[in-house]
């Protein structure tokens, strides 16, 4: 049985490679069939895909066809003198969607994040990077050539990535995208401020009299501003985040404050909350006061979902001594006054 099958395959191969036994003929109506070509007014057999005409027909012998070699192809009936070369390997910003074989050319298309600037018969000839939507913008569609269309995130949605793929996402529940910390202290001298620093996981305000340090862990909103100003021996300071990242509800944003007086006082106390209007947002705080230089301290911490319809907030406060008015003067930085970011809640403006 195997020998019979082998002979049958060999017979078919002979038909393809040798162009059958039929001789070229003169067409009665002057037209050749679709699988034929005309040469010297004779209709001759074309070579099938995957082969080429190693010898054209004459009056007695039909076309002789030879298989294409590696890296070459023919994709249709032909009487070409040689097979066509496949396209080269795909570029680094492309993916191969069809490999080179004897009947098909290699096809390369653009990788994710790219779009085709120049289309060819065998895939894309030139891929370029898609536009990346900035923070606060999401992908809303694509142009006719495949570039990204960016649109601002509407109310109730947000985006905190720079991406050519991410869309605006619904604002998550029971979380926050903004943290505002206000610290008011008395008494402090007019010349006490020396510098402010931001160091990533630890924000600090240093003065000749005291140091305010805030350590934070697992907080997705990123702290980006701080200030310190003094008026009539009442100092006002604050720390603020941006609004482009939401807190991961599986993690607890933990803030640890230390207000340390730069004297030899040995007192040390951990403050308890004076006010706790917090709800379902995931956060935790501790406040430590070291030294004896301050008689009164107010600390307000506000967690906000600025995209929520009802402007969701959690407010935490701590107090030592008298109630201090932290709304009576414009915040500044080392005696250089500057306005607070427009995104600050009205409670602290």
UniProtKB/Swiss-Prot annotation:
Its main location: secreted. Keywords: Disulfide bond, Glycoprotein, Host-virus interaction, Inhibition of host chemokines by virus, Repeat, Secreted, Signal, Viral immunoevasion. The keyword Cell wall biogenesis/degradation does not apply. Residues 1-22 form the signal peptide. InterPro entries: Poxvirus_TNF-rcpt-II_C, Poxvirus_TNF_rcpt-II, TNF_chemokine_rcpt-like, TNFR/NGFR_Cys_rich_reg, TNFRSF_N_viral. Inhibits host immune defense by binding to host TNF and various chemokines in the extracellular space. Binds host CC chemokines (beta chemokines) and CXC chemokines (alpha chemokines). The N-terminal region is similar to host TNF receptor 2/TNFRSF1B and binds host TNF. The C-terminal region is called smallpox virus-encoded chemokine receptor (SECRET), and binds host cytokines. This is Cytokine response-modifying protein B. It comes from Variola virus. The lineage of its organism: Viruses, Varidnaviria, Bamfordvirae, Nucleocytoviricota, Pokkesviricetes.
